[in-house]
Each structure stands twice: as C-alpha cells, then as structure tokens.
Amino acid sequence: MLSDRQQMILNAIVDNYIHSAEPVGSRTISKRDDIGFSSATIRNEMSDLEELGYLEQPHTSAGRVPSTKGYRFYVDNLIQPHLLEETELGKLKQLFAERILHAEQVVEYTAQILSQLTNYTAIVLGPEIFEHRLKHIQIVPLNAEQAVAIVVTHTGRVENKLIDLPEGIGAGEIEKLVNLLNAKLTDVPLWQLRQRLYQEISGEMQRHTEQYEEILQLLNNSLTQEEERVYLRGATKIMNQPEFRDVDKVKDILELLEQHDQLMNVIGMQGDGLTVRIGQENQLDAIKQCSIITTSYSLGGKPVGMVGILGPTRMEYGKVITVLNHLAEGLSRMLTSQFEK
C-alpha cells in the first residue's frame, strides 16, 4: 500500500497531467498549494513510485506520467466527486424533459449530449441489442452461389439477409453446420453471437469440414447485426487530444470506431454497472492507449443498454463518471416512464 505522502504526490501528478498533457516534474508539484513537500522529497517519492510501477518516464522528458497501474490506483482510491456546472446540468434536464416517441431517438440524443459534455467519443448501445436473443437461424440456398440467412429471435423478430455461398459448399453440409450453430447459440443475445461463434464453434467446425474458413465466414456474415443499434458521436474528438495528433497513432482507433460489431463486443463485455478499463487493461491493441468507461441503463429495473466514453488514458475520470451516472439514471427513468408496458 502506498504511504499517505505517496498517494498525495500520485494524485497531484495525475491531476496535473490530465490537464496539461505534459510530463510532470518535481518542481511543478512542489508549487501546488496542496503539497507541502520540498522538490527533493517529491523527486525521491516520484522515483519510488516509478520503481513500483505507478509512474513512467518518457524517453524525451525528465518528468513522469502515470502508468496504467497509476491511473488504476487513482480511479479506485483517489478520485474526488465532480460537481457539474449549471449549464451542464441544464443540458441533462432538457434531454430528459422531452417527450420522445421512440426509444432509439432517446438513445441517439443521449450519445450526442454525452459527447458534448465530456468532449470525448460517446458510444451508446441501443436497447434492441440487449432485448433480442437468438431462437434459431436458417440458411436457405437460393442457387449454387447465394442463400438467404434467416435469424429469428425469442421475441418473434425475423431478420433476412442475402449472403454469398462459398464455392463447392453443399446444402447438406450447410444444414449440418447450422444445426451445430443452433445447438450452441440458442438464447444467446444477438450482440454476442459473432464473438461466441469464434470462441465456441470454430474449433468444432474445423473438425467437421475441410472448408472450415469458408463456412466460418459464411456464418459470420449471416450473424452480422445492423449498425444503427450502435450510436456513436464525436468519433474524431480523439484527434483533438495532444497524444493522438499523430495520424498513425489514431488510425487504428478510427478504424475500430467504424466496426460497430467490434464496438458492441468491446462495450458489451464491460458488464452491468459502472466499469472503467484503462490503457493496457483493454484487450484490443487499437485501444491500449485509451480508457473506456461504461455503465448500464435500464427499463423497469432490467438492464437494456450501455452508455460509454472512449478517450485517452489521460481523461477527466471524475467528470466522465459523474456525467455517465447522471445520464444512465435519467435515461433509465425516462425509458421506464415512457415505454414500460
């Protein structure tokens, strides 16, 4: 456990770096009114914090920056409640005072307000993603080259999609593998289908057919969900951050933001309630320099969607968490009052 002095210094470094985007030196910290230690003492403690893995030293600077471990300690132990300004509260009140006919419209407005208030990229999973679970899938060949994939949910929703058939794939083989798919994925939420396909079924398919890759791609295409269920606002705001002004650094992030199925997996795997994933804690390489904060919203007490923020690891965690909590609570109340049956 860090000493009280180390915690004070780490808190000051994180706070300073969040607002300056510049590596922090001991002299900078010693000038703060809330720090009563000499520059030499701070320098020694910073060296210890670096050795313990809470700070890192960029090659081109004598200052330090927080590591993933440092940010994690800050979020879990040091973060202070953030008070929203009157103008920010006003935007939230205005959003939830509106009478809106469609749940999707509410969610779309939520993403817009979330991005405006935080100045980061907002990602919202609409209610439909969580409401629908697979009942069964059929793939009906039309000819040697094309088929119709039919996905039926437990709520009775039916989705049809025209797909191309791999060369040489017979109807019998397709039927056998679709039966395997139904046996393994029945009752799985639609947004999880593609992830579960690769996790649970790909190995078994490889044992059943030499055209494993072609069949896997066929099923993958059949399960692709419509993109409008992911609401994304402020996608390019990541480029406003100093650490992402290099196009090469931000390219992979922007490409990820265009892949809504990937975003559904990234946001959906966070879990219900407030979750913070920082830097290297993220599984995808594209966002290992980013943090993702999410929370769920509900309808009638049942979680039906997620709201989230993607930003640099150097994000204003206190403000983002406060905004997300306000939005999730307000969105849950609004959806419940207007759409609960």
Swiss-Prot record:
Keywords: Repressor, Stress response, Transcription, Transcription regulation. GO terms for biological process: negative regulation of DNA-templated transcription. Pfam families: HrcA, HrcA_DNA-bdg. The keyword Plastid does not apply. SUPFAM superfamilies: GAF domain-like (SSF55781), Winged helix' DNA-binding domain (SSF46785). It comes from the Bacteria. Transmembrane segments: none annotated. Disulfide bonds: none annotated. One of its GO terms (molecular function) is DNA binding. InterPro entries: GAF-like_dom_sf, HrcA, HrcA_C, WH-like_DNA-bd_sf, WH_DNA-bd_sf, WHTH_HrcA_DNA-bd, WHTH_transcript_rep_HrcA_IDD. Negative regulator of class I heat shock genes (grpE-dnaK-dnaJ and groELS operons). Prevents heat-shock induction of these operons. Belongs to the HrcA family. This is Heat-inducible transcription repressor HrcA.
